[in-house]
């Protein structure tokens, strides 16, 4: 319709006129692009919050299915294993969000834990502020994983928001003390 086309045109003009910054936008990483309704709801909640702050904020989502995520959520995407693309996005973004779900755990896979910890560290080294958003933490069973997670989170994360008290206890038992830690709620609810 004419209204739809006018809206698209206005959005393009607004984005074009948006002030340019050296570091701008956000990179969001979670278990996205897998067809899981819970993870999709978390991503939708994060995107709504980011767009309420700035509707034209550049957003890049690391996802298993870049095309579907790009079309569904109208965001830039990078494949989870496309390291060059997501590291480039991190160098330009001001914020990295590791978000939603229980990503910091070693029960389902140690590779998953290493992946998320590596990305957190890479975002910090790239100059992003790092937030863990609406997370569940644990269980992290292996002692070497607990030490690694505590080391990375203490050194690389600026703020952690948790979705339940057990996650706070898990972080405390691991010795995570440096980032600001807030008990909030599941972002999908």
Residue ranges and their predicted role:
Residues 1, 35-36, 182:
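Residue-level recognition of hydrophobic positions within alpha-helical transmembrane segments
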Residues 1-16:
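A charged, aromatic-enriched C-terminal amphipathic alpha-helix characteristic of glycosyltransferases
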Residues 18-141, 188-189:
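Aromatic- and Gly/Pro-rich donor/ligand-binding loops
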Residues 142-189:
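A nucleotide-sugar donor-handling region in carbohydrate enzymes
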